[in-house]
Regions:
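Structural signature of FAD isoalloxazine-binding scaffolds in flavoprotein oxidoreductases
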Residues: 81-86
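ATP-binding/phosphotransfer module of carbohydrate and carboxylate kinases, centering on a glycine-rich
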Residues: 1-2, 18-30, 42-53, 74, ...
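Active-site glycine-centered loops adjacent to acidic/histidine catalytic or metal-binding residues
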Residues: 35, 61
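Short glycine-aspartate micro-motif
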Residues: 55-59, 65-67, 98-100
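Adenylate-forming
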Residues: 40-45, 66-68, 87-88
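Short beta-strand-loop/turn "lid" adjacent to the catalytic site in phosphate-handling enzymes
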Residues: 1-15
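Short glycine-rich, Thr/Ser-proximal phosphate-binding strand/loop in the N-terminal lobe
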Residues: 4-7, 74, 80
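Active-site flanking residues adjacent to catalytic metal/cofactor-binding acidic residues
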Residues: 34, 78
Length: 169
């Protein structure tokens, strides 16, 4: 691969020679990959997948991705996008959410951190149930806020995660 960030769905970066910038800055060779592939390499080398030759590492965060390992090697595909689960269509129909990639109904629009926050906003706006989340600015709620409320037994927060989990599978 070229070391170039061709396009980042969640960042305003296009055609950034990131590996070269880092090499120039630190005087060391640099290679780049996405977070899911890096996580898979880390698990294969140091973590729960140590010694495994075939596995999939799912990542949920700003996006939804996976690092796929076959015969002890990360699978990149012909264009480097193997494992990009986030842009798999998970919801169809006129109410499917738009995604940053330009499509609608992508898994990432529901199961990412921003997707969970959006679900929280939608559910809180459509229910009169008590929830710890009402004490927060509805437009500033994060997935961490939902997690914290769920940890405290908040039923609406649990409903938000149930919805997300159903879509995630």
């Amino acid at each position: 691969y070229t070391g170039m960030i061709e396009g980042a769905m969640n960042l305003p970066w296009q055609s950034i020679p990131f590996a070269q910038i880092m090499s120039d800055r630190f005087g060391l060779p640099c290679k780049i990959t996405n977070d899911a592939n890096a996580a898979a390499m880390g698990e294969m080398t140091y973590g729960a997948a140590k010694g495994m030759k075939n596995f999939i590492m799912i990542t949920l965060g700003t996006g939804v991705g996976s690092g796929i390992v076959v015969d002890g090697k990360v699978v990149y595909g012909h264009d480097g996008f193997a494992g990009e689960l986030g842009h798999t269509c998970a919801v169809r129909g006129e109410n499917a959410r738009p995604c940053n990639c330009g499509k609608v109904g992508c898994l990432e629009a529901y199961a990412s951190a921003t997707g969970v926050a959006r679900t929280a906003k939608e559910i809180i706006s459509s229910t009169s149930k008590d929830t710890l989340l009402r004490a927060l600015n509805i437009d500033a709620i994060t997935s961490k806020d939902v997690f914290d409320a769920a940890e405290k037994g908040d039923e609406v927060a649990k409903e938000i995660f149930d919805f997300t989990g159903t879509i995630l599978g």
